[in-house]
Amino acid sequence: MSGFTNKDGRQNLAPCFNFRSSPFRLTVGERELKLEEDKNQLSKGLDPWTSNPTASASTLHYLLQEKERAQQAHEQLQIYQQQQGFGSFLQHRIRQPASRGPGGGGGGGDGGGSSGESTPVDALATAFGAGRIVRSAAGRKDRHSKVCTARGLRDRRVRLAAHTAIRFYDVQDRLGYDRPSKAVDWLMRNAKAAIDELPDRAEAPPPPAAASTEQPEGTEQANSTSYGFGNTTGGTMTSAASAAAGSFLPHSLGADRVSDSVKSLFPSSSTASGAASAGHDEYRGSPPDLLSRTTSNQQPQELCLTLQSNQHQIFSHVSSNHHGMISSAGVPGWPDHSQRMQAWHAPENSTGDGRGGGNGDGYMFAMPSRQGLDQSQLFSHGEPLQSSGRGWASARAWLDPLAVAAIHHQPSTMAAGQVGFGHLVGGAGGGGGFMGFLAPAAQRLEGEEEHGSEVIR
């Protein structure tokens, strides 16, 4: 290192480097590498010209904070502009009803409430022709924009039904327009006369309440006539009685198979002229000529209670072994001749077990009442019970007292008996009949070994 002499002859004491022997002498490639390293250090927040990394890090942190402040200020400015734009839109909406008058303002308020669309807070109202387009400030696509109408904000895009869209595009193709909006403008121009005749925002009349309530009643009446016993003069059955009748009466049975021997199935009563309210009272209070009226018509009606009769005298005697505890003596309103009701679908060559060929169906009969049990107690379990013949164990718990009374009573003590009608059930092959009165053939009383008939429960 040596000094050098200026033009005026004075010596410059500034240091002078010998670049030939200096280690700082770098080639072009080395200089480029050095610049790249400097850039990398600057990007990492390190100052290559200083040896204090703490100072360079604090400087970079300050720059980042300033950048964040600038971003926050920009966002606040955007929010302020959005609020100003939306405020002008609200002021415009407030001035519109005032210019229309009190009548128009009231209609506009009702229309805005009935639109069902909430006004977005971040929306911007942009003037577009004669109307306004409300765009979202979040930068979403144009399909989310809305227009200001007399009844509030509405979507610009309109969904059409499939057949309507097909017809509309056919009209557009025939007109030769490339955009659907042009076809809509053409349709509105041609329908201007009809549009002008329309009232302003006519409200649709509310649907009549009477028409909506009459339809279910008609349906219930149709169900009651198809599921009931065909009582056309005594009034229609209620919905509960209709459901109870439809729960066990088959549809496939016709009225042509009804025998004359079962016309006197129900006890005669001069006061029972109308249908009962619900449950077992429906069947117990039926008029005496219920079946005769339905079968004597010129056009046979569908009678779901179809019973086939054979010539076995089921109810004409009482068995000596107490298996046929059946009696109709002393029952008021019943005729003196024997009453019988054969099993459903009983074959002609039915066996002598009293079950109609073992099809799981039983008979309806009169059973004497136990002392201390009145008619209401006998029918305390009048709910419709469904059984397939294998579920007798669940019903025997409350039938045991009646079974004991039926077995140990003599036929002479059955003068003041009550008529008990159970619910008709059908079995798949293992016992059945009227719930609460007949037991399956497999379940016998203790000490009895006889076969060929059912034990009456």
Curated annotation (Swiss-Prot):
Name by which UniProt lists this protein: Transcription factor PCF7
UniProt keyword list: Activator, Coiled coil, Developmental protein, DNA-binding, Nucleus, Transcription, Transcription regulation
Recorded coiled-coil stretches: 58-84
Sequence segments annotated as region (Disordered): 95-121, 199-231, 263-299
UniProt gene name: PCF7
Subunit annotation: Forms homodimers and heterodimers.
Domain TCP, first and last residues per copy: 140-198
Pfam families (alphabetical): TCP (PF03634)
Molecular function in Gene Ontology: DNA-binding transcription factor activity; sequence-specific DNA binding
One Gene Ontology CC term in the entry: nucleus
Subcellular location: Nucleus
Record's compositionally biased regions (Gly residues): 101-115
Comp. bias (Low complexity): 268-278
Annotated Polar residues bias: 212-230
Function: Transcription activator. Binds the promoter core sequence 5'-GGNCC-3'.
Main localization category: nucleus
